[in-house]
From Swiss-Prot:
Residue ranges annotated as motif DXDD motif: 284-287
Gene3D superfamilies reported for this sequence: 1.50.10.160, 1.50.10.20
Species for this entry: Kitasatospora griseola (Streptomyces griseolosporeus)
Chain segments annotated as coiled-coil in the UniProt record: none
Record gene name: cyc1
Family named by the database record: Belongs to the terpene synthase family.
Protein name (record): Terpentedienyl-diphosphate synthase
Residues of the signal peptide: none
SUPFAM superfamilies from the UniProt entry: Terpenoid cyclases/Protein prenyltransferases (SSF48239)
Length: 499
């Protein structure tokens, strides 16, 4: 908490997508070699970038960056990296079933068609011969889930200098180069960032030139220098980072003093519309729920009526009009309403609580877990849903059955190492599983002993501090929010230490 109070810069992992786009767009003299070094070092043996199942966005972004700098074309590795990536992309596109449906990462439906259009000539140069005949034109296909029409509509508005929804500012790199008339409709946050994205900010800066303020240049200086040139997926999301850390600390380390600067920072970011992930980002239901929850625990005014602005008939939304609702947004909102009822005696939201709990239960898989659009791991979303449902108002049979199935799913998926994970067990995912099982074990009843035994078996897994966490959080690319993950693992270790 002291580190966060002293250094509010968000600590997110670097991203091949963001680095590639930054390399393509930025006009800074020192952009080039550091970004290329990172991209060449992170290319997979098969020629792609990114995590399995999430390759298309980071690979297209990396190819866009590497192929945009002709002055580096003769450098060893660059031409080969582009060729290997394009050949693998064609292999996927022309293979049985074609390209898979896009994962629900942020704005992938806009980013992918923009990059396919941008890279049409590059992809065409590396198209394999079909039927033994080379040189035949064949467009690279658009994957299911891409929305080229939406990208074209937004592009047309931008070309005419018209404003676009603020939620689309996060991906201005998809419309580079931007007309100066349009750029005048975009206002960076006080810290200089355009909706927390270095590549989007670079696209805006390219359009406005010397009209940009010193804060924007300082923001890009920091983003560019943090990892030696590799660019983080998002930056300047301090509210999201601190709210997730703060709520974990308040639950599992309640004696740790909370710095006054952090409380003041959250209060300053909260408005009548709620709070977003950072300055310049629109308010969302997730951050608003967690800001209310932490604030009430710390004695600040609480505003359930503001959270209710994100209520949509039977569930809470992250943003109005979103394509895919979030299980964990609803879990966090329900956790806050549970807290108000149990700790403050506020019962006026009972109907909302019941409907929200029913919606969460309806999203559970047959296997017993939950998935979510903000974190690819089911352990993150299952832990959040378990915590919300255990304290929900109606403890009826559907709810009890849902919790039983979740408990059995967690117990069933512990590995011989004592850890949990989608692929290889990871400390982050093991922590989520342990925190959820601890909620069951600490309340007694059916399955409590089995949960306690599983937690005890996780002790050995946590003794190996060399284990790494894969990027699991979903932005434009998969990423790791280092502070949030570090504190999550600390909480998991603290719980295991009690068994």
């Amino acid at each position: 908490m002291k580190d966060r109070a002293a250094d509010p810069v968000t600590k997110f992992s670097p991203s091949p997508y963001e680095t590639g786009q930054f390399l393509r767009i930025s006009e800074r003299a020192d952009v080039g070699t550091p970004q290329i070094d990172y991209l060449l070092a992170t290319q997979r043996p098969d020629g792609l970038w990114g995590s399995v199942g999430f390759e298309l966005v980071p690979t297209l972004g990396a190819v866009a960056g590497l192929s945009s700098r002709p002055e580096y074309a003769d450098r060893a590795g660059v031409t080969d990296a582009v060729a290997r990536a394009c050949e693998k992309l064609w292999e996927l596109a022309l293979g049985e079933g074609g390209l898979p449906k896009l994962p629900d990462t942020v704005a992938s439906e806009i980013i992918v068609p923009s990059l396919i259009d941008l890279l049409s000539e590059v992809l065409q140069r590396h198209r394999p011969a079909v039927g033994g005949k080379a040189g035949q034109e064949q467009e690279f296909p658009s994957p299911p889930g891409a929305n080229a029409e939406l990208w074209r509509q937004l592009s047309d508005r931008i070309a005419r200098g018209q404003a676009i929804p603020k939620t689309a500012w996060h991906t201005l790199e998809a419309f580079h180069p931007l007309p100066k008339q349009f750029a005048a409709t975009v206002t960076p946050a006080a810290d200089g960032a355009v909706t927390c994205s270095p590549s989007s900010t670079a696209a805006w800066l390219s359009a406005v030139g010397t009209d940009a303020g010193a804060s924007t240049r300082a923001y890009l200086d920091e983003a560019q220098s943090r990892y030696g040139g590799a660019i983080p997926m998002g930056s300047s999301m301090p509210y999201f980072e601190v709210l997730w850390v703060l709520n974990l600390v308040l639950k599992y380390f309640p004696d740790v003093p909370i710095p006054r600067e952090i409380i003041e920072e959250i209060a300053a970011g909260f408005s009548d519309s709620g709070i977003g992930g950072g300055p310049g980002l629109p308010p969302d239901g997730d951050d608003t729920a967690y800001a209310n929850l932490a604030g009430d625990k710390l004695g600040a005014p609480t505003h359930p009526e503001i959270l209710m602005k994100f209520w949509a008939e039977d569930h809470f939304v992250s943003y109005p009009g979103e394509q895919t609702p979030s299980e964990t947004v609803n879990a966090h909102a329900l956790e806050y309403l549970n807290h108000l009822r149990m700790r403050r005696g506020i019962t006026e939201f009972g109907a909302v609580e019941d409907a929200c709990a029913e919606w969460v239960i309806s999203q559970q898989t047959e296997d017993g877990c939950w998935y979510d659009k903000w974190n690819v791991s089911p352990y993150y979303s299952t832990a959040a849903c378990v915590e919300a449902l255990l304290d929900a108002r109606k403890q009826d049979e559907p709810q009890l059955d849902s919790l039983r199935r979740a408990r059995e799913w967690l117990l069933r998926h512990q590995t011989d190492s004592g850890g949990w994970g989608m692929a290889e067990p990871s400390p982050e995912e093991t922590a989520y599983a342990v925190l959820a099982l601890d909620l069951f074990a600490s309340r007694g009843g059916e399955g409590a002993e089995e949960c306690a035994a599983a937690i005890s078996r996780a002790k050995e897994f946590f003794t190996d501090e060399s284990r790494e966490n894969p990027p699991l959080w979903m932005g434009k690319d998969l990423y790791t929010p280092f502070r949030i993950v570090d504190v999550t693992v600390m909480c998991g270790r603290a719980v295991v230490g009690r068994y």
